[in-house]
Regions:
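Sequence signature of WD/YWTD-type beta-propeller architectures
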Residues: 1-416
Length: 416
């Protein structure tokens, strides 16, 4: 197979793990990181026209330094020409650098570049605000309808809390939806209003009871088709008190603004509360947990199957599926060596794509047959997460390309 290089400038062109292509298929969105760890010092979001291969800067964060604010991890809305990405807090400096609890979601409509739209509101001072969070959202994922956005979250207030009875700052999963939230602007520049109402929807415990379905962390979720349901990864404790990752499912009620057991906005010592009517259940009960290799869950179009990575009997990381209805797990890949990238699944659920042995591999899910599309070589080294095109039998992916100016992450495409 022959891959075609689409970008060439001497900077990074990092694709996020999901929803990188506009619904119309015309654009790919990326940030200019040249290393996955560099969001804090990255200041540009750009789009690539897939037909002309021209690029456009749609947002530049000013001012910018090695301490932040930082932008990155951009996704396209499923129903409009709008991108959403991580944006560090504008007052970032050496004392207050970009971090897990110091970021929010900002959108740009392509017809209005350079005009940031703050999506989730932020208020880190008591009294806190229902619908506003107190820390950092990231890894935003749009529902098929475009109405909801899921995210993972860490809490600045709890991170900074010194009270001995304060909840731990544990990663959780949240959802935002259209309903503007006003927050008073503070002199320090920590707070912002938002176009969306944000809530936390996963229930975590400071310390999970061994052998129970309690979780200490919720992360790396996906929407279940077009349903009001999410699947996510959660850390449980085994009867031997060891941490293990399992898959959980959340059902969302019609009204996410109703207060449940505790306040939606949280308190100085407690987490933001889960809305009334949200239910959470454990889906998998595996012997050793699913893979701890960082990856995001994926679903088929009907939301009846979740795809994930887990080690086989020989300890090799393979692709698996689990059925929502009965929890039955099936191994889909049978490689001799580990899958070593996050994966994506085609909307038809007929194929998956990922990296194995530094090769770009396409898996036929029905027959469990893999096909190597591209072999990595010293001049083109695969990195990141490969993606299926929305409209054609094309895969987009990142690779480092060497040049006289250095080695830079570029965007490629390849047919299959």
């Amino acid at each position: 197979m022959q891959a075609e290089q689409l970008t060439h400038t001497p900077n990074g062109h990092t694709l996020h793990h999901t929803q990188i292509q506009s619904a119309c298929g015309t654009y790919l969105v990326y940030d200019t990181r040249n290393d996955d760890t560099q969001i804090g010092e990255t200041n540009k979001i750009e789009v690539l026209h897939v037909n002309t291969h021209t690029t456009q800067n749609i947002y530049t964060c000013v001012p910018s330094s090695i301490y932040g604010p930082g932008v990155g991890a951009a996704t396209f809305a499923t129903n409009q020409l709008t991108t959403l990405f991580i944006h560090g807090i504008k007052n970032a400096d050496a004392q207050k650098p970009y971090g897990m609890t110091r970021r929010t979601g900002v959108a740009i409509a392509l017809q209005h570049p350079q005009l940031p739209i703050y999506m989730d509101a932020r208020n880190v001072y008591a009294p806190f605000t229902p619908g506003a969070l107190r820390g950092g959202t990231h890894s935003h994922s749009w529902h098929v309808s475009g109405e909801f956005i899921s995210f993972t979250y860490n809490d600045f207030v709890l991170e900074q809390a010194t009270q001995p009875d304060a909840d731990k700052d544990l990663r959780v999963v949240g959802v935002m939806f259209p309903k503007p939230v006003e927050v008073a602007i503070d002199a320090a520049g920590e707070n912002n209003s938002g176009e969306m109402f944000s809530v936390i929807v996963s229930q975590v415990q400071n310390t999970a009871t061994p052998g129970s379905d309690d979780i200490e962390k919720a992360f790396d979720e996906c929407w279940l088709g077009n349903q009001r349901k999410l699947a996510f990864q959660g850390h449980v404790r085994t009867t031997a008190n060891a941490l293990q990752t399992e898959i959980f499912v959340i059902d969302l009620p019609n009204d996410l603004t109703q207060v449940g057991v505790s306040p939606l906005e949280g308190t100085a010592v407690t987490r933001c509360g889960v809305p009334k009517g949200v239910t959470q259940r454990r889906l998998t009960h595996t012997p050793k947990g699913i893979s701890t290799f960082r990856h995001w869950l994926r679903s088929n179009a009907t939301g009846t199957v979740v795809y994930f990575l887990m080690e086989d009997a020989a300890g090799v990381t393979q692709l698996h599926e689990v059925r929502i209805g009965d929890g039955r797990i099936k191994q889909l890949s049978f490689h001799a060596s580990n899958i070593h990238s996050p994966f994506n699944v085609h909307p038809s659920a007929k194929h998956a794509v990922y990296f194995v042995a530094n090769n770009l591999v396409l898996l036929d899910i029905e027959s469990n047959t893999p096909r190597v599309l591209l072999e990595s070589n010293p001049d083109i080294q695969l990195t990141g997460i490969p993606h299926f095109c929305n409209q054609s039998q094309t895969i987009y992916f990142n690779a480092y390309v060497k040049s006289s100016q250095g080695s830079f992450i570029q965007i490629f495409k390849i047919a299959y």
